[in-house]
Amino acid sequence: QYCQCVVRNAACVLAGIKPAALFNFIPRRPQECATCSCERLCDAQVRRQAAQHALEFTRRYSQRGVRCDVLMVERGRALMLVSRSQELASLVGQADVAAFLQQAGFDVTGPRQLVRSLRIKMTGFERRREAAGGATFARIENTQVDAASASMLPSRPCMCIDDEPPAFPHEVGVLLGYPLADVLAFIAHDGKDELACGVWKAYIDPEGARACWQAMRECRSQALARYRTGATLSELIA
């Protein structure tokens, strides 16, 4: 189940065309729990399973530049990040990207510090949004795009009831491979007036973005097809 979830949501990371992917992982209940009344595993069980999967994934594939981290667990789901350390390091090696992320409160001294900052950002957002009575990350259920992408789609209006709803940390889009110019424009335009909408909202180069989205769709489709016919995660990593 976990491996299929990784392929479905992080195929482009495995293939090396995307620095990171953010997604929800929902472990199945064990067989001995099949007759109980609970709908899903408790957070402690989810945290334990997610941590085991992330640890094993990282142990196996970190030498090939890919790792997995658990960012947070709530309501029976784990928010997980599969990333390429070298690509994240390259991102923060770009002066404009580093300045943007640093201004947003990220530690840009290295990939691990960057992931740690992301964990703090996402946890803080979730806590504030939950306190405001809004939807939590546990309600993101779009398997075609990652969690941060889903938050940018127009079909997902803000459900917060506060006069000043907590702002989603849209700067995370840069870590997921979205162009910095589009992330900046998305923030400046309050998520409106885009020229094209797909994995992210494109403001600067819609045709280039569409080509990129198509390449991502093809990568994901091919990876899933290979996985279903017996390919291992190791074989899918570029």
Model-predicted segments: where are they?
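C-terminal alpha-helical interaction appendages
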Residues: 111-126, 160-169, 194, 201-217
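Short, flexible, solvent-exposed loop/turn segments with mixed acidic/basic and small polar residues
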Residues: 10-15, 67-73, 118-127, 162-163
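Short, extreme N-terminal leader segments that mark the start of a protein/domain
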Residues: 1-35
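Short, surface-exposed beta-edge/turn micro-motifs
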Residues: 18-20, 75-78, 169-171
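Hydrophobic/aromatic-rich, well-ordered segments within soluble, folded domains that form packed cores
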Residues: 166-196
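Intrinsically disordered, low-complexity terminal tails and inter-domain linkers enriched
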Residues: 38, 117-164
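A glycine-rich, hydrophobic loop/mini-helix early in the fold
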Residues: 36-112
